[in-house]
Design a protein with these regions (language model features):
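Active-site micro-motifs of SAM-dependent methyltransferase domains
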Residues: 8, 39
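Soluble catalytic regions of large protease machineries
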Residues: 29-34, 40-269
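C-terminal helical "lid" subdomain and adjoining coupling/linker elements of P-loop NTPases
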Residues: 1-6, 12-31, 125-134
Length: 269
């Protein structure tokens, strides 16, 4: 059992099983590369966000590509700034598509759903809207006989509902505008990340660090992972040994790829 086997199992649990049988066109691969590159770049550039662990454009589960962020430790609470930055990360894939292709696709459907849900909780549950204030809007009612999720207590007026909708939209639109500005200012890095994804299909957080610094990526194996060499082994103790050393080459992955997910997934709608 090698470390790559643990990595493969972890990726399968966190991101879903690879679907290499799903053949994407060159244009779909390019769109997915920029989409996932947008997520990864914004997550890398914004302070306080969870580090990017791995990015892949290999289809996994229902996703055409995945950007996986993993927290460095346990997190039991979230600041408003952290949530605002995460809204930007969620919307970065769609914004990257707009910038590069001057169009949008259905691939951002799950991202938009998650961003809207987060913004709604910020306004309605966590009191993070200056206009609405520290109030809970729309309490969940008791269970009703035809379904647990059917009953909702209507404890707010139509005017309040309009204000809530406006505040949710404001949070999402502000995040989108800030994300657009950040990606435009770092467009060369976005191109570099997309190219690396198209070349390798999967890149790691360490690869992203190198790309942001403008440094070349290390050679990679057939599975797309960086090729690493073990330190030289000592020469065998024999009479005819002439200082020979042996290096253990990294073995190729059995699965043919090591993809991973902000689960910011690019979802096929």
């Amino acid at each position: 059992v090698f470390m790559r086997d643990f990595e493969y199992a972890k990726d399968k649990v966190l991101m879903g099983k690879e679907r290499r049988s799903l053949i994407l066109s060159d244009e779909e691969k390019r769109i997915t590369a920029y989409h996932e590159g947008g997520h990864a770049l914004v997550a890398k550039l914004l302070p306080g966000t969870d580090p990017v662990h791995k990015v892949t454009i290999i289809p996994r589960g229902r996703a055409l590509g995945v950007t996986m962020q993993l927290p460095e430790g346990d997190r039991h609470g979230y600041s408003k700034a952290f949530l605002q930055n995460n809204l930007m990360v969620l919307l970065a894939g769609r914004v990257a598509e707009e910038i590069i292709f001057d169009t949008i696709t259905t691939g951002a459907g799950n991202d938009i759903e998650r961003a809207t849900g987060m913004a709604r909780k910020m306004v309605c549950e966590w009191g993070m809207s200056d206009v609405v204030g520290p109030m809970t809007i729309g309490e969940q009612g008791e269970e009703v006989f035809i379904g647990r999720d059917w009953g909702h207590a209507r404890n707010y007026s139509e005017d309040t509902a309009r204000i809530v909708d406006a505040e949710i939209k404001k949070l999402v639109e502000t995040a989108r505008e800030n994300c657009h500005k950040l990606l435009q200012e770092n467009i060369n890095l976005l191109h570099a990340l997309a190219k690396a994804l198209l070349d390798r299909e999967t890149i790691t957080g360490d690869d992203i660090d190198l790309l942001v610094k403008g440094e070349p990526l290390p050679p990679f194996d057939a599975d797309g992972s960086a090729a690493k060499q073990e330190p030289a082994a000592p020469a065998p103790a024999s009479a005819d040994a002439e200082g020979e050393t042996f290096k253990l080459e990294a073995e190729p992955s059995q699965d043919g790829g090591t993809g991973e997910k902000t689960q910011d997934e690019t979802k096929q709608q």
